[in-house]
């Protein structure tokens, strides 16, 4: 199902309407103070300009419909929720850029020194992105509950907005999951390379066999390096487990968003089905109307024949009465 993202255009038009509203209010107030005798005519003109179709069809630059729209029809309650979700989506994109730079910096270090600060920053950023995804998911699911008393048009608009937000979150979660999978693969490749360079055929021994290991050619510095590499491998395994956990969380979010999109598509299919059924019923009603019209015409002919028959009988009775006298 092809969709278009109209959220940015909606926000731009809404901001322009607020500015135009202020300009029109200033002009109207100055005009009323300068000529109070014409206040009633100005109010009548504003009432005429309040119509949505007039505001859309006419080429008015000041958008007077928005000038009185606040007093008559405030924006729906779910608009604030949409703004919050869009703000969180922007934060997710920014955090994903920061996480990508941290991944590159952590994997492309020229030295073998372990940097716990970078790993801690990666962990915190990943957790923040996951929390933002969960919060956006809950906010998108809670949007329909804010539109219980809205009109049919606002309900359709809200359905399109929810579908658009769900699709945007699904795309972001997909890209984030691919980024995490790529980082995990690069980590595994680096571990394989490190094991290839640092692996030895000599088995690790207990503390009592250190002298034997020393006589085989290992120095104390090499033993310390082996211990450091062991600690580094354990740390990498912990990072890999965290990445796998974040990917599993993203899979849950991805499934929920996919279910929401499928649900919205089912609603749209149901609407299409109802429209088709209404068209079919309208055509059937039109056929029945034509049949009723034909029956009505036949009834008129029968009524005329019946009236003529009654007139003939009356005339015959009158004629018989006249002749009998």
Swiss-Prot record:
Protein name as catalogued: Syntaxin-16
GO terms of molecular function: SNAP receptor activity; SNARE binding; syntaxin binding
Superkingdom, natural source: Eukaryota
InterPro entries reported for this sequence: SNARE (IPR010989), Syntaxin (IPR045242), Syntaxin/epimorphin_CS (IPR006012), T_SNARE_dom (IPR000727)
Gene Ontology terms describing biological process: endocytic recycling; intracellular protein transport; retrograde transport, endosome to Golgi; vesicle docking; vesicle fusion
Membrane topology: Single-pass type IV membrane protein
Entry's transmembrane regions: 302-322
Tissues and organs where the protein is expressed, per its UniProt entry: Ubiquitous.
Record topology, Vesicular segments: 323-325
Family classification: Belongs to the syntaxin family.
Gene Ontology cellular component annotations, sorted alphabetically: cytoplasm; cytosol; endomembrane system; focal adhesion; Golgi apparatus; Golgi cisterna; Golgi membrane; intracellular membrane-bounded organelle
UniProt organism field: Homo sapiens (Human)
UniProt function note: SNARE involved in vesicular transport from the late endosomes to the trans-Golgi network.
Domain t-SNARE coiled-coil homology: 230-292
Disease (UniProt): Pseudohypoparathyroidism 1B: A disorder characterized by end-organ resistance to parathyroid hormone, hypocalcemia and hyperphosphatemia. Patients affected with PHP1B lack developmental defects characteristic of Albright hereditary osteodystrophy, and typically show no other endocrine abnormalities besides resistance to PTH.
Residue numbers on the Cytoplasmic membrane side: 1-301
Modified residues (Phosphoserine): 41
